[in-house]
Regions:
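Short, low-complexity disordered leader/linker segments with a strong preference
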Residues: 1-32
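Extracytoplasmic small-molecule ligand-binding "clamshell" domains
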Residues: 26-110
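Flexible hinge/capping segments at coil-to-helix
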Residues: 52-55, 137-155
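A structural signal for short loop-to-beta-strand junctions that line the ligand-binding cleft
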Residues: 56, 70, 118-133, 217-218
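A ligand-binding cleft/hinge motif common to bilobed small-molecule-binding domains
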Residues: 93-94, 108-120, 166-171, 192-218
C-alpha cells in the first residue's frame, strides 16, 4: 500500500492561483504564501527553538521555528515565485478546514490524497510516495509479523484523521482499535508506554520512531 503525499492547496496550480470554495483567499496578492502544517510530524515537519538549518519562524507561535521536508518544499515554491514564506502551526484535523476558510493559502504537511479530501480542496499533486507500515516493540509477539493476517487481534492505534486510522487498521481482523492519537508523538507514546501492541504509520515516520526509540521495530 502506498501513501501519496500531496501539496494541499486553495489553488488549482501554483502558477495559476484561483479562489477555492470555503472562502479561501484568491491568490498570493500580498506576495506572502502562508502554509499550514502541524509542526509535529517529523521528518515532514517539526518544531525547534532556533532558525538553524534553514528553519522558518512559526508566525502564530512566537520564538519557535518549523523545519523538515515540508518546510524545504515550501521554501522552494516561494523562491521560484518570488514570495515570502509564512508558516502557521495547525492541529492535524484543522488543516483542511484552514485551507477552506482561508486561514492559510496552502497545506504542505504530508497529507494523503483521498477522494474525500479532493471534494473539499484542490491538490497540486504528489511530492512523495511512502509505504504504510506497522511499528511495534522488539519483544512483542507481533514483531515477526509479515502480513496483515499476522496482526489479527492486536490492540492498535494511529493518528487521528489519517488513512492509517480510518482505512488501514479496520482491515486487521479482530483488531482492538483504540482511540486515535491527536498527534504523531502521542501515537508513538501510546506504543512506548504499552497502551497498544502496535501502531500504523508511514515509513518515514516509522524510521524516525525507531531512531528515537531503540526498542521499537518496523
Amino acid at each position: 500500500m502506498k501513501k501519496i503525499l500531496c501539496v494541499l492547496m486553495a489553488i488549482a496550480m501554483l502558477a495559476c492561483m484561483t479562489a477555492c470554495s470555503g472562502g479561501a483567499k484568491s491568490g498570493v496578492e500580498d506576495g506572502v504564501l502562508t502554509v499550514g502544517m502541524e509542526c509535529a510530524y517529523a521528518p515532514y515537519n517539526w518544531t525547534q527553538m532556533d532558525d538553524s538549518n534553514g528553519a522558518v519562524a512559526i508566525v502564530n507561535d512566537p520564538g519557535k521555528f518549523a523545519n523538515g521536508y515540508d518546510v524545504m518544499i515550501a521554501k522552494k515554491i516561494c523562491e521560484a515565485n518570488g514570495w515570502k514564506l509564512e508558516v502557521i502551526q495547525s492541529d492535524w484535523d484543522s488543516l483542511v478546514p484552514g485551507v477552506q476558510t482561508g486561514t492559510f493559502d496552502a497545506v504542505i504537511a504530508g497529507q494523503s490524497m483521498t477522494a474525500e479530501r479532493a471534494e473539499q480542496v484542490d491538490f497540486a499533486g504528489p511530492y512523495f510516495y511512502a509505504t504504510i507500515v506497522c511499528v511495534t516493540k522488539e519483544d512483542s509477539p507481533y514483531a515477526a509479523a509479515t502480513s496483515i493476517a499476522d496482526l489479527a487481534g492486536g490492540s492498535c492505534t494511529a493518528q487521528i484523521a489519517t488513512i492509517w486510522y480510518d482505512q488501514c487498521l479496520p482491515q486487521i481482523e479482530g483488531a482492538n482499535i483504540q482511540t486515535a492519537a491527536e498527534t504523531a508523538p502521542a501515537m508513538l507514546m501510546a506504543l512506548e508506554t504499552g497502551m497498544v501492541d502496535f501502531i500504523c504509520t508511514d515509513m518515514p515516520t516509522a524510521q524516525g520512531a525507531i531512531a528515537a526509540y531503540p526498542d521499537m521495530v518496523i
